[in-house]
Amino acid sequence: MKKITMIKMEGCPYCAAAFQAIDEIKKNYPPTELEVIDENFQPQLAEKFTDYYYVPSMYVDGKKIYEAHPGESYDECFASVKKVFEAAR
C-alpha cells in the first residue's frame, strides 16, 4: 500500500469523523502507513501541501484524494476516506 497523509486540526469535528471512518475501513485493507500532520502543531510539515483549504485533507503519495467541506455528513466522509484507501492500494 502507498503512504496516506492526513492533515488535521485539533478539535475539528470533521477530522474526528475521518478518524472514525479510518478505524472502520482499515480493517478491510492491508496495513498502510498513515502519517497524520496537525496543521497547528506541525505547520512546517503542513505547508508542504499547498492545495487544500479545509481539514481533514488526505493525500496518497502527495496527491490530494480527499478534502472535507463544511456541512459534510458522516456518510460522505466515510465514502471519501474509502476512496483514499482504494487509491493507496
What role is predicted for each listed range?
Residues 47-49, 71:
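Short aromatic-enriched loop/helix-cap "lid" or pocket-rim segments at secondary-structure transitions
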Residues 4-6, 34, 58-60, 81:
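Hydrophobic beta-strand residues in large extracellular and virion-surface proteins
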Residues 31-44:
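Thiol-based oxidoreductase modules, predominantly thioredoxin-like and allied folds used
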Residues 1-28:
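Local sequence-structure signature of Cys/Sec-based thiol-disulfide redox active-site neighborhoods
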